[in-house]
Amino acid sequence: MSTESKCPFNHAAGGGTTNRDWWPKQLNLKILHQHSSLSDPMGESFDYAKEFKSLDFEAVKQDLRDVMTRSQDWWPADFGHYGPLFVRMAWHSAGTYRTGDGHGGAGAGQQRFAPLNSWPDNVSLDKARRLIWPVKQKYGRKISWADLIVLTGNVALESMGFKTFGFSGGRPDVWEPEEDVYWGSETTWLGGEERYGAQKKMQQPGDGTLVAEPENHANEESRTASGERNLENPLAAVQMGLIYVNPEGPEGVPDPVASAKDIRETFGRMAMNDEETVALIAGGHAFGKTHGAGPADNVGPEPEAAGLEEQGLGWRNKFGSGKGGDTITSGLEVTWTSTPTKWSNEYLENLFGFEWELTKSPAGAHQWTPKNGAGAGKIPDAHDPSKRHAPSMLTSDLALRFDPAYEQISRRFLNNPEQLADAFARAWFKLTHRDMGPLARYLGPETPAEELLWQDPIPNVDHALVDDQDVAALKGKILASGLSVPQLVSTAWAAASTFRGSDKRGGANGGRLRLAPQKDWAVNQPAQLAGVLKTLEGIQSEFNAAQSSGKQVSIADLIVLAGSAGVEQAAKNAGHHVTVPFTPGRADASQEQTDVESFSFLEPIADGFRNYQKGHYKVSAESLLVDKAQLLTLTAPEMAVLLGGLRVLNINVGQSKHGVFTDKPETLSNDFFKNLLDMGVEWRATSGANDTFEARDRKTGAVKWTGTRVDLVFGSHAQLRAISEVYGSSDANEKFVKDFVAAWTKVMNLDRFDLA
């Protein structure tokens, strides 16, 4: 008998066919249980903000400056300076952010983990992170990878002569890949067929003639710009594994005008307007080069597929030396300016100073070179001082010249370099800080003093706060005002549940529920909301006017307090006397401090906690519920207890009775779970789409309850049913109320970073 046949172990723990393999559409609750203490080596007592505040910030910056020009033989610096590589590293860390769901961005250092560490657009960034490992190693816990990556990009810009707008730390690392982010459904790198569906494919490359020449481009339409090309939400990249657009053009077609359409769509989904987009491209491409020294088949597997001996690196290149002048990254071989490690306006000067014709890189990728051999010898070689080149451009670069709106901005920046410098500094700061949330999270000596609208500013509290006696008195007035428990609870939920743990936006602080656009969202029942707010504002005015010591209560605080009063009253109705924890300190933002367009992305397309869905979607209602719970940073038990409690408190949008499995509404009982688990009823679908159901008494056939998919999933899904059985047990009443209050308080305080 052979040695192999004696061994009974063919697979390690966790291998084999999984539940997901058997049931691909099974509801995924794992996204609610990420980033726990079980995966965090720092321990639960670790306080990153405290550690960062003790950092010798200037010493870190000096160490990074030293790294910039200390070229390493194992990965030589282009032009003797790593600055452009580090700018790309920071850009690609932050540039995954998208407004639709707040996911992506630099805030958690996810570039270290799959899939981002192995995206085709991130080739060679594995080396960039290794180059700064000595700095990370030196300062250890005092600076996270997430902060260091962004800071390195800032220092790189400064070391190349650019004045940045500022830098703020405060991005604690996570220690595992984020499984909750939807990056697309394609199963091949650079695939785009799923995100564009069955839409018309781009035409094949033309003969290298620009779609629109300078003298008449405003009147000539791209052969593809008019075609239907709608990117799937919430994605903000045109192909799987790219940050934004294909630099060769849509689907590799070198059409600058069509490329502009993709650029506008993807950068817009990253919260950038046209001016910010032009500034980022023109500013970023003032530096460095792209790499396409040879055919892509010389490049080995990405980090996640590479062998153990590669130690987390990937894309080993067998072309020539595999590095330096033989580097293959994107397959494009473009250097934009003659001073690629020094800030200048030459990118725009070259863009408009030459006429361009299509050519190919040594790797066979579409790129552009000046016509008639113009510009020859203007550009230095990255590694061989004896060689010179002509400037070159990407299809996506030419979009800034041949798209009418981009061209107007680009020419203004060309003629006013100081405007480009200011716009790039501000856009770079926004790019690298967009997912950090409120200013309370910003740390460090270089945090800008200027208040920026995209930061969702909230005024500082400049008055004394209410004390326990005031809180009790205010709750009494609220409960005596005639407002019902559902009105109080639903209003507080509407305010707080806008929070997104992804980009730390939303929440009750700021009192923006009373402002556009939130006051007009259908999910918030505008007519009812207006009446509730009018009553609460009256209570606020009366209280504030009666104070002689400067004590005040904000409407933001009062909305949350009113919800707490409603929960306490509902618990009292069930025979439980509880006090919902309340911490004052919220402030009221103004309409002028609120970007209506930006806040529109926080409007929920579905809120299962209020049994609301705006439309019909491919994604199941229960999956949308889990997605909402994940954005609220809830665990599966917290999601369950909140939904079960909110159902019996009767806060459904439109006063729908779906899921209100109780004869005692406005009473905080565990009736939702008890009646859902009742075997005396039989559930049947009442719609062809299987999205509404009714429960009929097995003996009489009478309809007893109605519900939606988000209600029935708590009895259908095995894991959720197990949780429901805990809360539906006869001895669970007290635990249910206690857990509901804890989960409610968590949601009310999700945006209170000032309490951390």
Curated annotation (Swiss-Prot):
Cross-link named Tryptophyl-tyrosyl-methioninium (Tyr-Met) (with W-91), sites: Y244-M270
Region listing for Disordered, in residue ranges: 198-230, 371-390
Amino acids binding heme b: H285
UniProt GO molecular function: catalase activity; heme binding; metal ion binding
Nucleotide-binding among keywords: no
Pfam families: peroxidase (PF00141)
InterPro entries: Catalase_peroxidase, Haem_peroxidase, Haem_peroxidase_sf, Peroxidases_AS, Peroxidases_heam-ligand_BS
Cross-link for Tryptophyl-tyrosyl-methioninium (Trp-Tyr) (with M-270), residue positions: W91-Y244
Active-site residues annotated for this sequence: H92 (proton acceptor)
Keywords carried by this UniProt record: Heme, Hydrogen peroxide, Iron, Metal-binding, Oxidoreductase, Peroxidase
Disulfide bonds: none
GO cellular component: cytosol
Site residues by UniProt (Transition state stabilizer): R88
Subunit and interaction comment: Homodimer or homotetramer.
Protein's name according to its UniProt entry: Catalase-peroxidase
Organism of derivation: Pseudomonas savastanoi pv. phaseolicola (strain 1448A / Race 6) (Pseudomonas syringae pv. phaseolicola (strain 1448A / Race 6))
